Amino acid sequence: MVCGDVNGDGAPDQAVLGYRDHLLLLAIRQGGQLQPQIIQFAIGGGVQQGVCSLPVTLRTNELVCDTEEGQLSGCKIGRGTVALSIEDGDCDPINLYWSHEAGGMVWWRN
């Protein structure tokens, strides 16, 4: 589990990884909310929305909204706001940030 302000509201949020039925699950719970946002990722190579292998590491990172591919949709840098990444050591990391347009976490890859 990692903690950090992912949505920019100044309160710590929690993110945790779990596994179910050959899927990697990421649960993100915002400070005061009871119901987490759940994002599923495949386990195994060849799938864009997946990790190549286990084990994986969940990390908080500095939020960067301007990438080589352009500005991330709905991304807003705020004081203390963090991004997340899921890394397996084999594939490019899955990068996640809070999209103020989507109203939740979204992911992208390099």
Task: Go through each PLM region and give its residues.
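Acidic, divalent-cation-chelating loop motifs in proteins
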Residues: 1-9, 66
